[in-house]
Amino acid sequence: MATWLAIVLIVLALILGLVGGFFLARKYMMDYLKKNPPINEEMLRMMMMQMGQKPSQKKINQMMTMMNKNQQDQLKKSK
Protein backbone atom coordinates (compact mmCIF):
# COMPACT_ATOMS: atom_id res chain seq x y z
CA MET A 1 0.00 0.00 0.00
CA ALA A 2 1.29 3.42 -0.87
CA THR A 3 2.33 5.72 1.94
CA TRP A 4 0.12 8.56 0.73
CA LEU A 5 -2.93 6.27 0.73
CA ALA A 6 -2.24 5.21 4.32
CA ILE A 7 -1.94 8.85 5.39
CA VAL A 8 -5.19 9.80 3.63
CA LEU A 9 -7.04 6.88 5.24
CA ILE A 10 -5.72 7.76 8.70
CA VAL A 11 -6.73 11.42 8.34
CA LEU A 12 -10.15 10.42 6.99
CA ALA A 13 -10.73 7.98 9.86
CA LEU A 14 -9.70 10.66 12.35
CA ILE A 15 -12.12 13.20 10.89
CA LEU A 16 -14.98 10.68 10.80
CA GLY A 17 -14.26 9.71 14.40
CA LEU A 18 -14.32 13.32 15.56
CA VAL A 19 -17.58 14.08 13.76
CA GLY A 20 -19.23 10.88 15.00
CA GLY A 21 -18.01 11.49 18.55
CA PHE A 22 -19.34 15.04 18.51
CA PHE A 23 -22.84 13.98 17.46
CA LEU A 24 -22.94 11.05 19.90
CA ALA A 25 -21.85 13.31 22.77
CA ARG A 26 -24.41 15.94 21.76
CA LYS A 27 -27.23 13.38 21.71
CA TYR A 28 -26.14 11.98 25.08
CA MET A 29 -26.12 15.45 26.65
CA MET A 30 -29.53 16.37 25.20
CA ASP A 31 -31.05 13.16 26.60
CA TYR A 32 -29.33 13.70 29.96
CA LEU A 33 -30.60 17.27 30.27
CA LYS A 34 -34.10 16.19 29.28
CA LYS A 35 -34.14 13.52 32.02
CA ASN A 36 -32.32 15.68 34.61
CA PRO A 37 -33.19 19.32 34.05
CA PRO A 38 -30.68 21.77 35.50
CA ILE A 39 -33.35 23.43 37.66
CA ASN A 40 -36.27 21.90 39.51
CA GLU A 41 -39.17 23.20 41.59
CA GLU A 42 -37.19 23.23 44.83
CA MET A 43 -34.43 25.34 43.29
CA LEU A 44 -37.03 27.70 41.85
CA ARG A 45 -38.72 28.01 45.24
CA MET A 46 -35.37 28.83 46.91
CA MET A 47 -34.54 31.43 44.25
CA MET A 48 -37.90 33.14 44.67
CA MET A 49 -37.49 33.23 48.45
CA GLN A 50 -34.01 34.74 48.07
CA MET A 51 -35.44 37.43 45.79
CA GLY A 52 -38.03 38.29 48.44
CA GLN A 53 -41.04 36.79 46.68
CA LYS A 54 -43.51 34.45 48.30
CA PRO A 55 -43.41 31.32 46.14
CA SER A 56 -46.91 30.04 45.54
CA GLN A 57 -47.34 26.71 43.80
CA LYS A 58 -49.17 28.45 40.95
CA LYS A 59 -46.20 30.77 40.28
CA ILE A 60 -43.75 27.88 40.41
CA ASN A 61 -45.86 25.82 38.00
CA GLN A 62 -46.10 28.79 35.61
CA MET A 63 -42.34 29.32 35.67
CA MET A 64 -41.60 25.62 35.17
CA THR A 65 -44.04 25.47 32.24
CA MET A 66 -42.48 28.56 30.72
CA MET A 67 -38.96 27.14 31.11
CA ASN A 68 -39.97 23.80 29.60
CA LYS A 69 -41.64 25.56 26.67
CA ASN A 70 -38.52 27.65 26.05
CA GLN A 71 -36.37 24.51 26.16
CA GLN A 72 -38.63 22.78 23.62
CA ASP A 73 -38.51 25.83 21.34
CA GLN A 74 -34.71 25.85 21.47
CA LEU A 75 -34.61 22.14 20.64
CA LYS A 76 -36.82 22.73 17.60
CA LYS A 77 -34.60 25.59 16.43
CA SER A 78 -31.43 23.52 16.77
CA LYS A 79 -32.81 20.70 14.61
UniProtKB/Swiss-Prot annotation:
Membrane topology label: Single-pass membrane protein
Keywords: Membrane, Transmembrane, Transmembrane helix
Transmembrane listed as a keyword: yes
Chief place where the protein resides: membrane
A cellular component annotation (GO) from this entry: plasma membrane
Name of one Pfam family that matches: UPF0154
Ranges annotated as spanning the membrane: 4-24
Family in the record: Belongs to the UPF0154 family.
Name the record gives this protein: UPF0154 protein SSP1415
